[in-house]
Every structure is written in structure tokens, then in C-alpha cells.
Amino acid sequence: MQAKAVARTVRIAPRKVRLVVDLIRGKQVGEAIAILNHTPKTASPVVEKVLKSAIANAEHNYEMDVNNLVVEKVFVDEGPTLKRFRPRAMGRASQINKRTSHITVVVSEKKEG
């Protein structure tokens, strides 16, 4: 059985969030939370919140044992981009893309054996 949590339209670029989610893929949930607590990246608290939500979903909705949970899948998709403009020389303007992310965490019970 799998439990999932999704955070949509998080105002951090997907490229930066992927650096953090790569650290926890395949780990036990306790170890993953410890890694996120000690990772000095802006995306770490957001990913930790989504992971804790997935754990709570597993415990409440599917009655899984929290001690046996592992991070089965974790991935980041690109959300909608906010387009802004920055004034430049000689009356021109440059486009600034403020990127957003959709973060998905899937946890499941560790297989015996």
C-alpha cells in the first residue's frame, strides 16, 4: 500500500528542490527527516512538511506502521511560471521567470525479507 502527499505551486525553482529530494529517495522516513533537518537549503523545510504529510496520510488513512515506512518515490515537477520584467538600459526590459514547483512524496511499507 502507498500513501502520497503533494505540495503544489511552491515558490522555489524545481532545479533547486531536486537537489534536496535526491537526498531522501529510498530512505526510511526517520532517516529522511533527520537528513532534511540538517540540510541547509531553502527547499528542505518544504520537502520535510510534504514528507510529514505523507507519513500522516499513511498512518491515518491506511493504518500503516510508521516505523516500517520508506520513501518509495519522491519527484518534483515544474509548476506555472510567474513572468516579471526588469528595466534595462536604453528603455529596454528583460523578462525574469519566477519558477514554481509541484513536490510529490510517496511512502510505502518496507517489504519483509
Curated annotation (Swiss-Prot):
Gene Ontology biological process terms in this record: translation
Entry coiled-coil feature ranges: none
Annotated keywords: Ribonucleoprotein, Ribosomal protein, RNA-binding, rRNA-binding
Gene Ontology molecular function: rRNA binding; structural constituent of ribosome
GO CC annotations, alphabetized: cytosolic large ribosomal subunit
Pfam families membership: Ribosomal_L22
PANTHER family: CHLOROPLAST 50S RIBOSOMAL PROTEIN L22-RELATED, LARGE RIBOSOMAL SUBUNIT PROTEIN UL22M
Entry function: This protein binds specifically to 23S rRNA; its binding is stimulated by other ribosomal proteins, e.g. L4, L17, and L20. It is important during the early stages of 50S assembly. It makes multiple contacts with different domains of the 23S rRNA in the assembled 50S subunit and ribosome. The globular domain of the protein is located near the polypeptide exit tunnel on the outside of the subunit, while an extended beta-hairpin is found that lines the wall of the exit tunnel in the center of the 70S ribosome.
Subunit: Part of the 50S ribosomal subunit.
Family to which this protein belongs: Belongs to the universal ribosomal protein uL22 family.
Name the UniProt record assigns to this protein: Large ribosomal subunit protein uL22
